[in-house]
Every structure is written in structure tokens, then in C-alpha cells.
């Protein structure tokens, strides 16, 4: 199928928009794939229509009907609660197992996960050991429901290539893969294309995120990830890196999803979709 272009409904969070707003925009720009963030429980802001997250307590049949009526498929559910370390053990496992169930009900083939912040009081080998245990439990559900669990570079551990290879290599499991992120890897100080190649064996999807000049000057090499960027794809300092990654994906006949992440102003979405389609020659 090749590269499947979609976008993340979370783009509407900064706009106080709803999941329905994201659906309408995807239809407007002829995108067939949408990614959505999840919450555990009821978030009143979402229910009032001012946040695009989906509660895993929602009626999945109703959501699936909305997507089907608009010709959309969920590419991934973005659970993104820190699953690394003790925090993941206490709170993350039970959440991810239920997101896996919800993903299956919605027809989403993947669930995204992230690491925690740096834990200076916990040696890295201990963090790895605990995290392996956490994913071991999650993967039991992933196997039963045939859902791919993605690990996204978003923090100090996922930005550490050696740590990532130890974690992924421990399992060598087709149900544990990587959701790449062009913006986070740039902020971490990586050359996104080089880090993409380093993890390429495991990558099944990618967030496409540019970075504005001011944010890059303030955060690059100091932070490990950003939620969103105010600039459209192609208008930030990460544009050349994104182009290189996309062209490399195309050259390598990548078969998977790429999901636009930018603040969802009308102009940003329009420009981002057009820029990526131009790069890919679509």
C-alpha cells in the first residue's frame, strides 16, 4: 500500500477543537486516515467539544460509525501514558490493556506508547528491567487482540538508541514496533534521518512534525520531545530533515502510516497536507 498520509486529531487540542472537527478536516483535505488520543475515564472538556481526545469508556460502535460514514480509518490510538519504569507498572499497564481492547473495537491496528521523564535515582539497567516487565504484560493483550504496540521517541530513554535496541531486541516481537517522530528526534539532538535509519527495522509509522525556529533555539538538545508545533509542516527549521525522511521512506518502499502533527489552524493543515503531498509526488 505504500505511505499512507493521515493526521493526528490531537492537532485540535490547541484550538480547543473536538474529534468531530478533526474528522471534518480530514474529509475536507481528502485524507483517509486519522489518529486519535485516548483518555481513561470521562474528561468533561472533551464531552463539551473542546478537546479531541476519545474516552476509552465511549461507545466504540458510535465512533466507528462516524468514521465509516466519512470514509475514514483509524491508523492508531495514541495512548501515550508513560509506560517506562515504576509509574508504568503502577498505572500504565491497566490503562494500555484497555486501550488495546478499545483499539480492536474501533478497527485501529496500532497503539502508541511513550517513556517517562528521566529518573536520576533509578539506574538505566533497572529502568530497562522494569520496562521490559511492563511491556511483557501489555504484549499478552496485544497478541490476543492482534494489535501492534508502538514505542515513540519522546523522552530520554526512547531518545537513547542503545536503550531502544536493548528493549526492542529483548522481544524481537512483530507486535512491538516503533512510531517514529521527526520533531521529537530533532529536539533530542538527533539528525532525524540518521535516527530513522538506526531504528528502521522496527518502524511501522511516523509522526511528521516540524519545529519553529524559536522553539528549536530554546529546546533542542535540552528537551526530549514536544507535543505540537505552531508552524505547518515545511515552514520550520526541521523541514529539510522531514523531506529527507519522507524521500528515504519512499525510496525504501515504506508501507505504513505517516501522521501530520501541527497546530490545527486552517492554514496550517492546508499547507502541511500540500507540502507533504508535493514531497511524495502525490
Give the ranges of each region predicted by the language model.
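Short glycine-centered, acidic/aromatic-flanked micro-motifs in structured strand/loop junctions
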Residues: 9, 79-81, 115, 151-153, ...
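Active-site acidic/histidine proton-transfer and metal-coordination neighborhood
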Residues: 21-24, 60-70, 83-178, 239-243
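Conserved beta-strand positions in the central sheet of alpha/beta enzyme cores
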Residues: 35, 76-78, 112, 150, ...
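Histidine-acidic metal/acid-base catalytic patches
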Residues: 1-33, 68-70, 107, 158-282
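The substrate-binding groove and active-site-proximal loops of carbohydrate-active enzymes
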Residues: 11, 50-54, 81-89, 231-236
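Flexible loop residues that form catalytic
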Residues: 39, 82, 116, 211, ...
Amino acid at each position: 500500500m505504500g505511505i499512507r498520509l493521515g493526521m493526528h486529531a490531537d492537532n485540535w487540542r490547541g484550538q480547543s477543537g473536538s474529534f468531530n472537527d478533526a474528522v471534518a478536516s480530514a474529509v475536507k483535505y481528502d485524507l483517509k486516515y486519522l489518529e486519535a488520543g485516548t483518555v481513561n475515564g470521562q474528561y468533561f472538556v472533551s464531552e463539551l467539544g473542546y478537546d479531541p481526545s476519545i474516552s476509552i469508556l465511549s461507545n466504540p460502535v458510535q465512533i466507528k460509525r462516524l468514521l465509516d460514514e466519512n470514509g475514514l480509518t483509524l491508523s492508531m490510538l495514541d495512548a501515550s501514558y508513560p509506560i517506562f519504569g515504576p509509574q508504568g507498572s503502577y498505572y500504565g499497564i491497566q490503562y494500555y490493556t484497555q486501550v488495546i481492547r478499545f483499539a480492536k473495537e474501533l478497527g485501529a491496528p496500532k497503539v502508541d506508547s511513550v517513556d517517562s521523564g528521566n529518573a536520576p535515582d533509578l539506574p538505566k539497567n533497572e529502568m530497562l528491567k522494569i520496562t521490559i516487565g511492563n511491556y511483557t504484560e501489555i504484549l499478552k493483550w496485544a497478541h490476543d487482540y492482534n494489535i501492534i504496540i508502538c514505542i515513540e521517541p519522546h523522552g530520554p530513554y526512547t531518545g537513547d538508541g542503545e536503550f531502544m535496541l536493548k528493549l526492542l531486541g529483548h522481544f524481537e516481537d512483530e507486535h512491538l514496533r516503533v512510531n517514529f517522530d521527526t520533531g521529537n528526534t530533532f529536539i533530542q539532538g538527533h539528525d532525524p534521518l540518521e535516527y530513522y535509519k538506526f531504528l528502521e527495522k522496527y518502524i511501522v509509522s511516523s509522526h511528521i512534525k516540524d519545529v519553529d525556529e524559536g522553539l528549536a533555539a530554546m529546546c533542542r538538545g535540552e528537551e526530549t520531545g514536544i507535543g505540537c508545533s505552531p508552524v505547518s509542516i515545511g515552514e520550520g527549521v526541521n523541514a529539510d530533515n522531514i523531506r529527507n525522511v519522507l524521500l528515504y521512506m519512499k525510496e525504501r518502499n515504506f508501507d505504513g502510516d505517516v501522521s501530520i502533527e501541527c497546530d490545527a489552524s486552517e492554514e496550517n493543515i492546508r499547507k502541511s497536507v500540500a507540502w507533504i503531498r508535493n514531497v511524495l509526488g502525490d
